[in-house]
């Protein structure tokens, strides 16, 4: 959630005239994150988060805002989109699509405990169940075709060893069979910096703007690779099991998902390794930029490749 498009106090005052939220009291840019422009907004009626969308078109965004509304109304701790006086949740500010959502309690964690991992596992399972009644299907914007199309621009930044690993992983992903796995709407970016923890409870799940319909277990693999991983890329057994046990208690995991577990971690690893590589070497212009190190996900991917049998033992108690 970096600041790429500046918004002045006066511009925000003018924009808020379209809302019934009272007087603007404070406006602060949010430096963390890598894709959209975000500000904390304080008014006479409370605190909100303003997002200016740097990549999505206005036509794409209503599905994401509708999903957030759908989940929030079913008890999932996620931001609730605020509608303006015309009844619209999406507007435009400084030439960019813009939305205002509720500001939730809590803070992101650098070093989550097993209790924190259990809390986010439980919320993710509830989110998957709540999303089953969301009737809109959202298309994946960063699928394998997206990665393959960008291989020529990434090639100069890969040494020979990484280029061989990339070729092998793309071949693996293409052959990876997920037809027996449950599908639905997934968050697809459930990293620690997209979750607010309020004590040992989840205060808020943020940034649904890369959600899409896919294999539910892919969401688990993405989250585990950030919440339950040590600095060297190895999985922390206690945190992994706490996450999976809590998820399983809400939406029971299947034997097919168990068999797919090591492979799904590889698929998640390659996506984020290449996405971070892209964001590092081809950044958007902006005032406050925060790019994440692709080497972190390179390590996670390598460990997932090397530790298949060990990963199969990191599973729920049956």
Curated annotation (Swiss-Prot):
Q: Which keywords annotate this record?
A: Amino-acid biosynthesis, ATP-binding, Kinase, Nucleotide-binding, Threonine biosynthesis, Transferase
Top-level EC class:
transferase
The metabolic or biological pathway listed in the UniProt record of this protein is: Amino-acid biosynthesis; L-threonine biosynthesis; L-threonine from L-aspartate: step 4/5
Q: Name one GO biological process term.
A: threonine biosynthetic process
Gene, per the UniProt record: thrB
* PANTHER family reported in the protein's UniProt record: AMINOGLYCOSIDE PHOSPHOTRANSFERASE DOMAIN-CONTAINING PROTEIN, AMINOGLYCOSIDE PHOSPHOTRANSFERASE DOMAIN-CONTAINING PROTEIN-RELATED
Q: Which family does the similarity line name?
A: Belongs to the pseudomonas-type ThrB family.
Q: Name one GO molecular function term.
A: homoserine kinase activity
Q: Which organism was this protein described from? A: Methylobacillus glycogenes
What protein am I looking at?
Homoserine kinase
The organism sits in which domain of life? Answer: Bacteria
Q: Which reaction does it catalyse?
A: L-homoserine + ATP = O-phospho-L-homoserine + ADP + H(+)
Extract the InterPro entries matched here: Aminoglycoside_PTrfase, Homoserine_kinase_II, Kinase-like_dom_sf, Pseudomonas-type_ThrB
